Amino acid sequence: MDSFTGRMAEADALARANRWPEALEAYSEVAASGRSDFSFHLHYGTALLYCERHLEGRDQLLRALRLRPDSVDALNNLVCAHFQLGAHVAAEEACRHILLHQPLHDLAWSNLGLALASQGRSPEGIEALHRAIDLNPSNRVSKDNFLQVLNNIATDGAGLAEAHLTLCCDYSEVPEKALPCTEGRRIRIGYVSGDFRQHSVAYFLAGIFNNHDRDAFEIFCYSANSRVDWMTSFFKEQSDHFQDITGIADADVAHRIESDGIDILVDLSGHMLDNRLSLFSLRPAPVQASYLGYPATTGCPFMDFRLVDSLTDPEGADAFATERLVRLPVPFLCYAPFPNAPEPSALPALSNGYVTFGSFNNATKLSDDTLDLWCHALDSTAGSRMFVKAACFSDALACEQLKKRFALRGIDPGRIECSGMITGMRDHLNAYGKVDIALDTFPYNGTTTTCEALWMGVPVITQVGNLHAARVGLSLLSAVGLGGLATTCAEDFAALAAAFSEDVHQLENLRRRLRTVVAHSALCDQRRFTRALEEAFRHMLRPGP
């Protein structure tokens, strides 16, 4: 065995142990030898993906596929690379390639569902995910993917709740633990998330971690994702204990949580990527709560509480939740703006001579209802244009597909500008300088994008529905004193867009002062919010309703 063959074996062993940075170093040494065979390119590409080097990883996987075009392993990993690069049309094509040769491949159907939804084609995505679940009813990932996508188009509370109950009925029943006595000691809160990094969820956690009463609460973080960045360092510094649980078996993590004596275990992911709901099913803590990262009930019998507010979940919403709803007396989340955000730009309408509407929401939220609303707004405002930014629009075909959807509704595609992924947070925020008025998505409202728009001086018009996901815009806008921008029908949505567009001086004035308004609003009152959250935690530990 030559040295490079031995080093390849070492790299493979490190990869099997999930020691990806070390594995990548070893594969890189093998690459320097000039090795070029299918197995090497597949494994090297996979290691690059795990180390966040997605473009290089994709290139290695493409080299592997040139040597073995129908390799399902390489194609599946290529799908992951395409997702990370925002190339959702290419991800769809790779999934269809797999299914051409293996039509019963449930993972390919599941990924196809996500790829379609990521292009705003959620109904087609739901069909593909149905197929994945039918082929493999025990695959938890496909069920989670299905529920994620369903939120993009759901308007019926009973139907959404039933879907969650049905797909979560396979979790085993585990007896509840007795409520702990916390008198004379700090309450131990455990947060479980795959997003302790630069991620949308992190911007709503930062204020909490900055303001927790550390004399009264001991903070534990259980990270379900090994990716790290400057935000990860922040969470490590602002918690008492930080544990990476990536790749560790649920039973072992549950034992660790029990040993840590956690009083309340808080899930921050729901059915989203990197969730550990299966860990919660073992009931490692006496009280378990869902918060922030998911816009609906989990449907899980082992989740005791869900944190909301009275606007997102008014009276009657309890009927659609398996958890007990705890309504905070403040907005259900608190925004911590990006610390180095650029200043808001001048109003673009003043130099353009027309109003530009915009959306920076994930393309999964671009439902038919959303496009209908936006087209009403464009119809009502002569000369107006629409700027739509989402990762998938780095692909020209995805842009063409979106413009066709506008054209089918009578809107000239020339009025629509698409933008793909923008690297760097400052550049991303600077792109709001192209937008005069943001239009929200429906029935799944924006959250981070709404907060970003407001911080950059851009007002947001939202449509209010019946479910939590369709009421987040109302909560956010009300928190900054702009509840009047929340409408309840398409006619009012369009009328409000037209009225705003006719008074650019009012828009300019609002743009100049909006950041100050937001900074001093309930949306950014981190201390007040954290005190309310801590009181909610104390409530959860009291016996009775």
Segments and roles (model prediction):
Residues 1-354, 362, 368, 372, ...:
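Alpha-helical solenoid repeat scaffolds of the TPR/TPR-like class and their adjacent stem/linker regions
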Residues 216-218, 375-404, 408:
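A conserved nucleotide-sugar
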Residues 267, 360, 389, 440-441, ...:
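Thr-Gly-centered strand-to-loop micro-motif
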Residues 272, 440-449, 463-471:
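Nucleotide-sugar-dependent
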Residues 392, 409, 455-456, 467-470:
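Active/binding-pocket-proximal capping segment
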Residues 454-455, 478:
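Short alpha-helix at the nucleotide-sugar/activated-sugar donor binding site of glycosyltransferases
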Residues 470-481, 486:
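Short acidic/histidine- and often glycine-rich active-site loop of Leloir-type glycosyltransferases
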